[in-house]
Amino acid sequence: MKLRASVLIGATILCLILSACSNYAKKVVKQKNHVYTPVYNELIEKYSEIPLNDKLKDTPFMVQVKLPNYKDYLLDNKQVVLTFKLVHHSKKITLIGDANKILQYKNYFQANGARSDIDFYLQPTLNQKGVVMIASNYNDNPNSKEKPQTFDVLQGSQPMLGANTKNLHGYDVSGANNKQVINEVAREKAQLEKINQYYKTLLQDKEQEYTTRKNNQREILETLSNRAGYQMRQNVISSEIFKNGNLNMQAKEEEVREKLQEERENEYLRNQIRSLLSGK
């Protein structure tokens, strides 16, 4: 009886083991460019594009936020989702700040799922470390009846609604015509124009200075050349004078020699005459 019970228990355990082995887990698939093993393929869904939020896509808004300016990265983890949600639902993005930084943000947004039909406008400025982003999804037509709403995106708080609300950077964005933002951008453009004019004037001054230096160098070379020619002429004249002096000296020496020779000849004749007169 005990033996039969033991056999029955063993058979039951064997059946359970075989049943468990027959329902083995499905093999997981390792995706490319990943060092970890993901979940089963049944749980992986791929989308051709990120869907829009029904409320945000139908709500006109203009949002201005001051994006961070970290050295090694752009956004904190807690800021990424909300910022991309804002960017993805916008029709127009204006980035104001350092030229390299705003270009990094633009490329970052476009490379990480932002809609391809978003219009990006870059406004580079000097002496501004951070980046200001103005995002809107409403019609820019001043006759439009759409009124934008303001959201404190990076803080993740509730929408700040109302006629006199202000966003993070202190601008009133409750109306479709954001005069303060427009004036700020206009001031930035005027500043850039002044800077461009300054560098243009500086370049013209440098070109004028270079031209003046070249002219001075040419005048100096001409002066040195004239002096060298004058010195050469003086040397030639001096050489001619020296040569003429030598010739005159030689002529005088020759004249002296001739006179001496004539004196010797005269003395010789006088001696001959004296000898004849004395009868010797």
Curated annotation (Swiss-Prot):
The gene is cagT. The keyword Cell membrane applies. GO terms for biological process: protein secretion. A lipid is attached at residue 21 (S-diacylglycerol cysteine). It holds the Pfam family Cag12. Coiled coil: none annotated. It is found in: Cell membrane. Residues 1-20 form the signal peptide. It is a lipid-anchor. Keywords: Cell membrane, Lipoprotein, Membrane, Palmitate, Signal. GO terms for cellular component: outer membrane; plasma membrane. A lipid is attached at residue 21 (N-palmitoyl cysteine). The keyword Lipoprotein applies. This is CAG pathogenicity island protein 12. InterPro entries: Cag12 (IPR025264). It comes from the Bacteria. Its main location: membrane.
